[in-house]
C-alpha cells in the first residue's frame, strides 16, 4: 500500500504539472559535500552552496529568523530552471541554506517575487501556532507564447514547505502590456487596511520618448482577489520594483515613500494607499555595475529598513573559469535612510551593524598623518576587510588609497573608482567606507549618499593597504577591521 500511495502521489503531481519533472529539481541533498572553502567563495556575502543564483526574493522576518529566498537554478551553474532557493539567518550575516522552497509547476518556472507575514489572517491559513508566510511570484511560461502571470503560495511551518494558492492559477492575470510582466511586491498598508501589490507591467519604448514604462498598483483584503488601484508611469522603471516608507531625518512625524526598480533608480514621494505621487526627480542608488534587483525585508523587528541586492558579474566566468561550484552572490545587507541635504531629500545606505560580529582584528588610528599610517600598516596582511576613513575637506586635495591593488582616488572633493565618480556633499568632513570580499568591493561615501558596488578580484598574494599622496595628509579616523568568515559556524538551530 505504501508503494501504491507514493505512485499515486507522483502520478497526480505529474498530471497537475505537465512539462515539469519535479523530482529533477529536488537537488539540495547533493549540496551536502560543499565546505565553503573554495578559493573564490565570498567570505561575508551570501552565496548558494552550489549552482546559480540571482535576484533576492521574499525577504521577510518572522519569529527570530530572517528569510532570504532567491532566484536559483538547482541544476546548473548558469541561469535557468528558476526556482526559489531559501536561506535563514538570526542576524542577517550568518546564513544557513535550506531545501529549495518553491519549485516549478505547469509549463513554467518560478520567477522573482515577495513574501509577507499574514498577521490579519487575510488568506485564512493561519494556525494556532503559526502565522502564514504568504509568497507571491511570477509564473514564467517556458514556451515563448503564453503570458506570464502572478501566482502565490503559503507556508505555515516557518517557510520550510509551501502550498500553492488556488493550485497555482493566476491571482493577478497578465495585464496585456508585456508578455513578461513580473516581480510582484506585496505589503500591508495600515492606514487603508489592505494589502497592496506593486507590479512592473510595461517597459518604456526607446524609440518613442512619450511611451513610458508602467508600474501598476493593486489592492486586496483577502490576498487572493486584487483590484487595480492606479498606475505609475516613468521612463526608468524596469522589473523588480519595491516601495517602502522611510522616516526623513529619523523623524516619525515626517515620512516619505521610496520607489525603486532593479537598476536602483529611485524617486521619493507620498503614497495614500491608492496612488503614488513623487517629485519626479530620478536618482541612482548605486553607481557601480553589479548591484541589481535589490529588495527590502518585510516586517523587520527594530524599524530598520534593510536592503539586499544581487551582486551580478558581467563576466560569469569569474566563477566558472575557476571551477567554482557556485555562481553569483548577494550584497551585504544595508540599512536605508532618507536624509535632508542641500540638494533635497536623498537616500543613504550603510552596512548593518551586525557586521561587527565578524571582526577578527581591528586597527583604529585617530588624528594620524598618512606617512605614519603607512608605517603602521606596513607588513600587516589584509584579506577581507571593513575599512573606514574620515578627513577634513579643506586640508585634503587629493590622494589614492591602495586596497590590495584596488585603487580608490580622492580628488577635488569626490571619490573615483574605475573612473566612476562618487560625488560627496559639500561639507567640511568627508568619509568613506569600503567592504572588500574575495571578488567584490562595496564603497560607501559620505555616510552612504554615494554607493558603488562592483566586482574586484585582488591577487591572493597582494595583502597590503597604503595611502599614496604627494603631500602629507591627516586622517581624523582611519579604521581597518579584518573580517572573519560567515561560514565558520551555523547560527540557525
Segments and roles (model prediction):
Residues 1-17:
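Bacterial Sec-dependent N-terminal signal peptides
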Residues 17-57, 76-79, 95-127, 159-188, ...:
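Surface loop/turn signatures of beta-propeller and other carbohydrate-active proteins
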Residues 27-31, 272-289, 297-493:
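Beta-rich accessory regions
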Residues 65-68, 123-137, 192-197, 251-258, ...:
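Entry beta-strands of beta-propeller and related beta-repeat scaffolds
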Residues 73-77, 140-144, 202-206, 314-315:
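Short glycine/acidic-enriched loop and turn motifs that connect beta-strands
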Residues 77-82, 143-148, 206-213, 260-261, ...:
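Short, solvent-exposed loop/turn segments at conserved positions within beta-propeller repeat blades
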Residues 83-85, 150-153, 214-216, 265, ...:
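A short loop-to-beta-strand structural motif that recurs across blades of beta-propeller domains
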Residues 89, 155-156, 217-220, 269:
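Conserved Ser/Thr-centered positions that define the repeating blades of beta-propeller domains
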